[in-house]
C-alpha cells in the first residue's frame, strides 16, 4: 500500500487544510490535531467525512438519516442509531475509489485508526485540491463561453439590424428610381459612344500611320537606288580620267568647254540647292575635275545621259514633295478631327462628372444618414450598458443575499444537529433513569415480599405455641 498515486500529508497540513477549506465556523475553530491522530474521535471523523461529501457531491445532511425505501424493514426503530453510520460508509465507499483509495472498510468508520485515517485524508485532500483547481478552470471557461455567446448573440442581432438598415439605405426610393434609372442609362450611353468613337478614330489613325510608313519606306528605297547610280557614275568618271591624252591645245579647248559646262552645272546646282535643300544628300554635286577629254564624245554623251537622269531624279523628288505635302494636309485634317473628338470627349466627361457629382451627393446624404443611425445605435448601446451594469449589481446583491441565507441555513442546521444530539443524550439518560427506577421498584417489591413472608412466618411461630398451651 505504500506505492500511492498521491502524496502523504503531515498531520499539521491535514488539520490546516481542513480548517481553511472544509470546515467553517465553530467546527474549524474546535478542530485540533489530537481529535484525529492522538485520541481519534469517531464523531469528529464522521463530521469531516460528511462535510467533504457535502462539498464534493452536494449531499444534504438529512440524506444520512433517511431509511432506504426499496427494502422492507420489520423494525425500523432498531436501525435508527446505526443508519447515519451505514449511509456514511456507503457514500464513502463510492467516493474513496475516486481518490485512489480502494481498501476502505466498515471498521474505518466505526473504529478508525490514526495511520489509515491519515492516508484516507491525504487521498481526499489531494482529490479536493485537484477538483478545486479544475473547477476554477472550468468555471472560468464556462464564464468566458457564456460571455462570448452573449456577445455573439448581441453582435448577431446588431449585425442583422445593421443589415436591414443597410438594405433600407441601399434601396433607391420610389420617387427617385426614374431619375436614377435615367442617369444610369445616360452614363451607359455616353460610355458606349465614347468607346465607339475612340475605336473608330484609333483605327483611322493606325491606317494613316501605316500608309505613311509604307510611303517613307518606298521613298527611302528610291533614294538608295539614286545613291547607287551616282556611285556608278563616279566610278565611270574615274575610269575615263585615266584615259585622257594630255595635249595643250586640246586641253585648252576642253577647259573652255568644261568651264562653260561647269558654269551651267553650277547654275543648275544652285537652282537644285535652293529648291531642294531637304534632299541635299540625295543629289551630290559632281566634283570639279580637270577632264581633259576632247577626243571622246562618248564621255559627253554619257554626261548628257547623266543630266537626263538628274532631271528624272528631280522630277521624282518633286513628286515625292507633292506627296509629302498631301500627307501633311491629311495629317492636319486628322489633327483637326482629333481635336473635335477631344472636345466631344471633354463634353461627355463633363456630363459624366456632373452625374458623378449627383451620385456623390446622394452617397454623402446616405453616409450622413448612416452616421446618424450609428450615433443613435451607440447611444442605445450606452443606455443598454448602464442597464446591464444595474442588472449585474442587482444580481451581485441577490448572490450576496443567497450566500447569507445559505450561511443562516448552515447555522440553523448546526443548531438543529446540536439540539438533536442534546435530545438523544436526554433520551438516553431518561431511558437509563427509567431502567434504574424499574430495577429499584422490582428490588423493592421483592424485598417487600420477602419481609412479608418473614412476618407471616413469625406470626405462624407465635400462633403455634399459644395453641399448644
UniProtKB/Swiss-Prot annotation:
UniProt-listed Gene3D superfamilies: Ncd80 complex, Nuf2 subunit
Recorded GO MF terms: microtubule binding; protein-containing complex binding
InterPro entries with a match to the protein in the record: Kinetochore_Nuf2_N, Nuf2_N_sf
Compartments reported by the entry: Cytoplasm; Nucleus; Chromosome, Centromere, Kinetochore; Cytoplasm, Cytoskeleton, Microtubule organizing center, Centrosome
Stored PANTHER family: KINETOCHORE PROTEIN NUF2 (PTHR21650:SF2), MEMBRALIN/KINETOCHORE PROTEIN NUF2 (PTHR21650)
Family: Belongs to the NUF2 family.
Protein name (database record): Kinetochore protein Nuf2
Organism: Gallus gallus (Chicken)
Amino acid at each position: 500500500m505504500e506505492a500511492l498515486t498521491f502524496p502523504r500529508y503531515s498531520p499539521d497540513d491535514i488539520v490546516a487544510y481542513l480548517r481553511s477549506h472544509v470546515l467553517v465556523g465553530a467546527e474549524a475553530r474546535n478542530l485540533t490535531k489530537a481529535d484525529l491522530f492522538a485520541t481519534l474521535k469517531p464523531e469528529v471523523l464522521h463530521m469531516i467525512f460528511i462535510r467533504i461529501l457535502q462539498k464534493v457531491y452536494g449531499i444534504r445532511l438529512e440524506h444520512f438519516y433517511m431509511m432506504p425505501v426499496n427494502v422492507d424493514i420489520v423494525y425500523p426503530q432498531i436501525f435508527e442509531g446505526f443508519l447515519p453510520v451505514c449511509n456514511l460508509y456507503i457514500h464513502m465507499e463510492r467516493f474513496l475509489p475516486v481518490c485512489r483509495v480502494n481498501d476502505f472498510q466498515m471498521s474505518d468508520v466505526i473504529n478508525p485508526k490514526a495511520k489509515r485515517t491519515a492516508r484516507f485524508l491525504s487521498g481526499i485532500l489531494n482529490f479536493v485540491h485537484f477538483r478545486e483547481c479544475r473547477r476554477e478552470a472550468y468555471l472560468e471557461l464556462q464564464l468566458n463561453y457564456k460571455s462570448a455567446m452573449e456577445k455573439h448573440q448581441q453582435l448577431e442581432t446588431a449585425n442583422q439590424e445593421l443589415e436591414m438598415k443597410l438594405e433600407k439605405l441601399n434601396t433607391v426610393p420610389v420617387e427617385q428610381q426614374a431619375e436614377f434609372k435615367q442617369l444610369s442609362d445616360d452614363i451607359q450611353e455616353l460610355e458606349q459612344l465614347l468607346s465607339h468613337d475612340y475605336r473608330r478614330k484609333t483605327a483611322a489613325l493606325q491606317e494613316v500611320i501605316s500608309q505613311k510608313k509604307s510611303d517613307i519606306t518606298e521613298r527611302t528605297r528610291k533614294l538608295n537606288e539614286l545613291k547607287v547610280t551616282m556611285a556608278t557614275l563616279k566610278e565611270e568618271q574615274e575610269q575615263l580620267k585615266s584615259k585622257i591624252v594630255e595635249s595643250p591645245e586640246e586641253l585648252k579647248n576642253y577647259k573652255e568647254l568644261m568651264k562653260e559646262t561647269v558654269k551651267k552645272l553650277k547654275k543648275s546646282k544652285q537652282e537644285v540647292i535652293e529648291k531642294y535643300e531637304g534632299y541635299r544628300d540625295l543629289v551630290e554635286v559632281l566634283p570639279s575635275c580637270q577632264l581633259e577629254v576632247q577626243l571622246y564624245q562618248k564621255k559627253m554623251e554619257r554626261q548628257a545621259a547623266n543630266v537626263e537622269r538628274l532631271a528624272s531624279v528631280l522630277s521624282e523628288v518633286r513628286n515625292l514633295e507633292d506627296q509629302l505635302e498631301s500627307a501633311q494636309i491629311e495629317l492636319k485634317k486628322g489633327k483637326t478631327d482629333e481635336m473635335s473628338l477631344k472636345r466631344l470627349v471633354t463634353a461627355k466627361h463633363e456630363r459624366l462628372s456632373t452625374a458623378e457629382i449627383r451620385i456623390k451627393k446622394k452617397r454623402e446624404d446616405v453616409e450622413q444618414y448612416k452616421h446618424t443611425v450609428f450615433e443613435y445605435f451607440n447611444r442605445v448601446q450606452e443606455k443598454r450598458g448602464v442597464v446591464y451594469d444595474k442588472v449585474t449589481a442587482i444580481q451581485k446583491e441577490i448572490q450576496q443575499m443567497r450566500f447569507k441565507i445559505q450561511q443562516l441555513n448552515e447555522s440553523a442546521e448546526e443548531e438543529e444537529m446540536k439540539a438533536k444530539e442534546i435530545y438523544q443524550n436526554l433520551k438516553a439518560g431518561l431511558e437509563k433513569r427509567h431502567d434504574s427506577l424499574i430495577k429499584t421498584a422490582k428490588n423493592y417489591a421483592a424485598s417487600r415480599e420477602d419481609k412479608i413472608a418473614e412476618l407471616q412466618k413469625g406470626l405462624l411461630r407465635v400462633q403455634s405455641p399459644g395453641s399448644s398451651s
